[in-house]
Amino acid sequence: ILGKLLSTAAGLLSNL
């Protein structure tokens, strides 16, 4: 679960 959240956060930051 935490890993998925971190992955999503990283994806959003990369999108910026």
Swiss-Prot record:
Tissue specificity annotation: Expressed by the skin glands.
Keywords: Amidation, Amphibian defense peptide, Antibiotic, Antimicrobial, Immunity, Innate immunity, Membrane, Secreted, Target cell membrane, Target membrane
Annotated localization: Secreted; Target cell membrane
Record-listed Leucine amide modification sites: L16
Main location (coarse class): secreted
GO BP: defense response to bacterium; innate immune response
Name of this protein: Alyteserin-2a
Organism: Alytes obstetricans
Family from the record: Belongs to the frog skin active peptide (FSAP) family. Alyteserin-2 subfamily.
